[in-house]
Amino acid sequence: MGKVEELHARHILVDSEEKAREIIGKLDGGAKFEDLAGEYTADPSGKGNGGDLGYFAKTDMVPEFSDAAFALETGAYTKDPVKSQFGWHVIKS
């Protein structure tokens, strides 16, 4: 059996596309992802750790999230918000 590919990522979860786009704008302007996660994320587990999700396999997350996260270059973040059943995500690899 082959090794399962895993990815380390962070995310910021918000309730609107507009808010997610605002966060992406702040990142484009040089804001630190971890700081924005602490300020904005609706994910309680991400508030105190900069949105850190640790390592996960593609099958551990909903497809919309995994597809976007696994497509990122290391250190990059999504330039468009990612919609899932939980809300809108900004993801950083």
Feature names for model-found ranges:
Residues 23-64:
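Peptidyl-prolyl cis-trans isomerase
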Residues 19-26, 68, 72:
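Solvent-exposed, amphipathic alpha-helical segments
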Residues 3, 11-14, 27, 56:
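Short N-terminal micro-motifs specific to bacterial/archaeal maturation
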Residues 14-18, 35-36, 75:
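Short, amphipathic alpha-helical interaction segments embedded in low-complexity terminal/linker regions
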Residues 12-19, 42-43, 58-61, 93:
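Solvent-exposed coil/turn segments that connect beta secondary-structure elements
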Residues 1-11, 39-40, 64-93:
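Proteostasis/folding factors centered on peptidyl-prolyl cis-trans isomerases
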Residues 5-7, 18, 47:
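Short glycine-enriched loop/turn motifs at secondary-structure junctions
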Residues 9, 22-23, 55, 73:
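Residues at structural and domain junctions
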